[in-house]
A protein has these predicted regions:
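A short beta-strand element within beta-rich, extracytoplasmic domains
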Residues: 102-118
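N-terminal targeting leaders for non-cytosolic proteins
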Residues: 22-86
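Extracellular carbohydrate recognition and processing domains
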Residues: 132-160
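Short beta-strand-plus-loop segments that form exposed binding edges in beta-rich domains
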Residues: 168-176
Length: 211
């Protein structure tokens, strides 16, 4: 009897811990470096629009997140399949981030989303877009949190680096239930070799115009 109690307690702790880790299970290697920002939303209540959780990092002010749409298609739920604090929506999530006004050629945005949708397993049910428009996007990883929820990580590249970006997360022809969103950004400086190549490219273009 005691072993059964101990087993149940241990399994409960493992389940809670694994879910918590999965929410921010894949942070970028560069988190905390110079020129980075960080923000996380766990939707503990239905505040909308909302600021990030305590611990966010951004010298230009707190970013904001808004879940768009109206009841009954857009609705905050205190619990969904064992996940506390979830937004159900069919419209889109909009995140606005003020950022470094630096003349860099590249910005990377690292997006983690923990969610469930009725079309998971039939192609990617989420569409990620940005303003200004993204240069490239890559699905870095997708892992099952439990029998219903997944955590996905996206790497988005903007070029050149903007001082303000808006991120949109939109379901593709389905209803999504989002448990957590984590956003990291970094304004990157190219390697010296890349700078040299950019310079040579510009010089070649200048010579061509003169010719």
């Amino acid at each position: 009897m005691k072993w059964r109690v101990v087993f149940c307690v241990v399994m409960g702790v493992i389940l809670v811990f694994s879910t918590a880790v999965a929410d921010d299970y894949n942070p970028p290697d560069w988190r905390g470096d110079l020129g980075t920002t960080y923000a996380k939303w766990s939707f503990d209540d239905g505040t909308n629009p909302s600021g990030p959780e305590t611990g966010w990092v951004n010298p230009f002010g707190a970013p904001t997140l808004e879940v768009t749409g109206q009841l009954p298609l857009t609705e905050w739920k205190a619990d969904d399949l064992g996940h506390q604090g979830v937004w159900k929506f069919e419209d889109y999530i909009q995140i606005e981030i003020a950022n470094y006004d630096i003349d860099n050629p590249i910005k990377e945005i690292w997006i983690q989303v923990t969610y469930q949708a009725d079309s998971i397993g039939q192609g990617l049910p989420l569409e990620i877009s940005t303003n200004p428009g993204l240069t490239s996007i890559e699905l870095v990883d997708q892992e099952a949190v439990d029998a219903f929820y997944y955590s996905e990580t996206y790497s988005v590249i903007l070029s050149p680096n903007p001082s303000f970006e808006t991120i949109f997360i939109e379901p593709r022809n389905c209803t999504a239930y989002v448990d957590q969103v984590v956003i990291d950004t970094i304004c990157t400086v190219p390697e010296p070799a890349s700078v040299c190549l950019l310079g040579l490219g510009g010089l070649a273009l200048l010579r061509k115009r003169r010719a």
